[in-house]
């Protein structure tokens, strides 16, 4: 199930959960996740961001539509590579790019600017 991220309270809860999880078992993606979240807010068609829910909590999967291209994208954490992946269309789509804290904000901006 998903929830529309239509207000700052939902986005705040999502960011809080991402940072909590990154402090426990994904220490190498917290800063990159915050950069990516800001970039998605910049690029997304207003009202298009959806966040997966799991047992009533917000989970690590996000779907959004680009305001510029109207294409759909999915973001999820890959537990094997310990990176966040941006995928084409869905969480099963082609990986467009992967990021971690080693990815510079400039690189994330460059990758997002093409979407």
Q: Can you describe what each PLM-predicted range is?
A:
Residues 1-54, 109-115:
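N-terminal non-globular leader segments, chiefly Sec-dependent signal peptides
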């Amino acid at each position: 199930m998903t929830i529309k991220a239509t207000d700052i309270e939902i986005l705040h809860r999502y960011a809080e959960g991402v940072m909590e999880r990154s402090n426990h078992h994904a220490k190498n993606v917290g800063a990159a996740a915050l950069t990516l979240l800001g970039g998605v807010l910049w690029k997304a068609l207003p009202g298009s961001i959806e966040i997966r829910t799991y047992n009533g909590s917000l989970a690590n999967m996000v779907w959004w539509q680009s305001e510029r291209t109207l294409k759909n994208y999915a973001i999820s954490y890959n537990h094997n590579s310990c990176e966040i992946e941006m995928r084409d269309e869905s969480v099963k789509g082609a990986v467009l790019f992967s990021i971690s804290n080693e990815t510079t904000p400039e690189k994330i901006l460059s990758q997002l600017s093409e979407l």
